[in-house]
Design a protein with these regions (language model features):
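PEST-like low-complexity, intrinsically disordered acidic/proline/serine-rich tracts
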Residues: 53, 58-366
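Vicinal oxygen chelate
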Residues: 5-58
Length: 366
């Protein structure tokens, strides 16, 4: 209280007074103050240990006699707009683990432990209190979903085709040459490392941070922007002619349509320079966005690539609405990163050394 009074005397405005929040892991208090650029800053008391999320039923999931009615835009289509977060889905594995083959749903304790392992394994030595307050995980209970893949029923990616297996064997054999080969240019690093694209459906997947998903709509179009790499897809919902067969794009050529309250997006025409689990430029991705409640958005994706897998496979997880706090700020990726500079300058230095040595050897032979 004394510290709060001192802050107020210096003109600091508390948007939420210091208090012990519900679910606090200690008796320490937390308050929020207004900062420049519409940023809200948490001010915490010494001894703060974060907040345990409520594992009880979401308000959206409480049984009701009245079914949820999806809101409409002024032009009459389902309204999916808002700032959605994939934090709740962080930690869900793509494939079903072998030891959970017959498990329908994790217990709350198992879900919390899974998120803890994944998060701590990703952020190394950061203090837990900063992890809790900066990554946003205190705002959502971990998902109890066992795995993302719902089809095939075993929750596993189907086997590779013979053609794909052959490509995989060749790739393993040539990997040693790739490692030994001297870097020639930026293209020796992947598009993801260079912050160009994660491709699809990788763009949509939750990670340890940057899980924001902003959806905007206008008549005939839906724009989907992901926080990680700030990739934006503009999806037409009115039927149109597809791009020519010779035009390939990082995120493909999408075509959307409405099926009741669900946005369905079919995408083809990938350039093959990114892949997800080995997918190729021949992949067809079918996505379904369905609002299940005021704060719940179900995302389902079906992957078809007959040149890679023997059958299609489908995954599903949810996003949560967070218009109150979440904001997509400027995305910084390689500012101040000297990795690529060192890789290429080192390779060129080796080129010069070898050229000089060869010239000296030739001169000596004469």
């Amino acid at each position: 209280e004394t510290a709060a009074v001192g802050l107020r005397d210096r003109g600091v405005h508390f948007t939420r007074d210091p208090e012990r929040p519900e679910g606090g892991r200690s008796e320490a208090k937390r308050g929020f103050v207004a900062a420049p650029d519409n940023v809200r800053v948490a001010v915490i008391e010494s001894g703060w240990r974060g907040v345990d999320a409520d594992f009880g039923s979401d308000a959206d999931q409480v049984a009701s006699a009245e079914p949820y009615v999806v809101p409409r835009t002024p032009w009459g289509t389902p309204d999916l707009q808002g700032m959605w977060s994939g934090n709740k889905a962080h930690g869900i594995p793509l494939e079903r683990p072998d030891d959970l083959a017959d498990v329908a749903e994790l217990t709350p304790e198992e879900a919390a432990a899974r998120r803890e392992r994944g998060t701590l394994g990703s952020i190394w030595g950061y203090e837990r209190e900063w992890r809790d307050t900066t990554l946003g995980y205190v705002k959502s209970a971990p998902s109890r979903q066992v795995a993302m893949i719902i089809d095939p029923p075993d929750g596993r990616i189907p086997p590779l085709t013979e053609e794909a297996q052959e490509r995989q064997r060749n790739a393993r054999q040539s990997f040693g040459d790739y490692v030994r080969r001297r870097p020639a240019g930026p293209e020796d690093l992947s598009a993801y490392v260079r912050c160009i694209s994660r491709g699809l459906p990788g763009m949509m997947m939750p990670s340890i941070y940057n899980n924001g998903l902003q959806i905007s709509q206008s008549p005939g179009f839906v724009a989907i922007q992901k926080e990680m790499i700030h990739e934006t897809r503009v999806v037409p919902t009115a039927e149109r002619e597809p791009l020519g067969a010779g035009i390939k794009q990082w995120l493909g050529d999408p075509q959307g349509r409405w099926e009741g309250d669900t946005l369905v997006v079919e995408t083809t025409g990938f350039n093959g320079r990114t892949n997800y689990r080995g997918s190729s430029e021949n992949m067809k991705l079918t996505e379904r966005y369905t609002r299940l409640g005021p704060n719940r958005l179900e995302y389902e994706f079906k992957v078809e690539d007959p040149t890679v897998w023997t059958s299609s496979w489908t995954g599903r997880f949810e996003f949560e609405l967070d218009n109150e706090q979440y904001e997509l700020v400027e995305y910084a990726c390689h500012e101040g990163n000297y990795g690529m500079t060192n890789i290429l300058s080192g390779a060129r230095a080796r080129d010069r050394e070898e050229a000089a040595a060869a010239a000296e050897t030739g001169s000596g032979a004469q």
